[in-house]
Amino acid sequence: NYKDALSASGNKGVTRHYPFVPGIDAAGVISDGNSLQFTEGDEVIVTGYDMGMNTPGGFGEYINVPVEWVVKKPDNLTNLEAMSIGTAGLTAAASVLKILESSNESDLPVLVSGATGGVGSIGVMLMSKLGKEVSALTGKSSSVEFLKSIGAANVIMRDNYLEAPSKAIERPLFSCAIDTVGGNVLSKMLPQISPHGVVACCGNVAGIEVNTTVFPFILRGISLCGIDSAESPIDFKNSIWQKFADEWKLDLSPMIKIVTKENLQQEIDLILKGGQQGRV
């Protein structure tokens, strides 16, 4: 996860005190505890909250967390599948649910920015699985075939997209969007969303500022919705895990890369440079 990379590289905005064990996602077996809710041997998942930020996280062999952070792993998910989904998958799923709640009935494509990242790639897969036409936005020309293989109908190169002239309100190009990057990409897409569409915003790697006008909101009734899966209520997280184990079951094998702890640093460097593809 991007937040893991920030913590591992000494970002005091994420982790205040070092040395520290990062990892905002974990899956494993209860070895000890004082809760009546779980017993020794139960297979569980923990994502988000303070874990991996200032509470030692999933890069360790053992973790000690409040019971309120813990979800029982669905039987139809392996630990590998659960961690291939992780916080990124929960964020993508929360974004998809927000879009599905909208009254937008356009048959225009759904735009997914940062589409090769963890949130973006799972967002592409989910939207495609739900029968939506997906336009994947990426800065990596080498990832076009990867994006098509996981469900993207169209791949848009980021530089070409950003170079095109912008207006305060434009011809609708997309029904809704999952934006994982923020900044100028988010600013660019807002005037292109069709009436009553939703933009689910969940990232800021392209910047924390958004340059827009009120026109997309008051002339088309679009909604810009913030997505924060880390602090979501545990019941909401549990419902998403059940979906991933059932009707939203995904074949994640094309997008995962397994490494040892000894090779973590090179993956941390890669994600900070925007070079990671899928989930590690």
Ranges and model annotations:
Residues N1, S9-M51:
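Glycine-rich beta-strand-centered segment in the early N-terminal region that forms part
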Residues Y161-P172:
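Short amphipathic alpha-helix with an adjacent loop that forms part of the alpha/beta core around
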Residues M83-R158:
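Mid-domain Rossmann-like dinucleotide-binding core that forms the NAD(H)/NADP(H) cofactor-binding site
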Residues D42-E43, Y62, K129, V198:
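Residue-level marker of beta-strand positions
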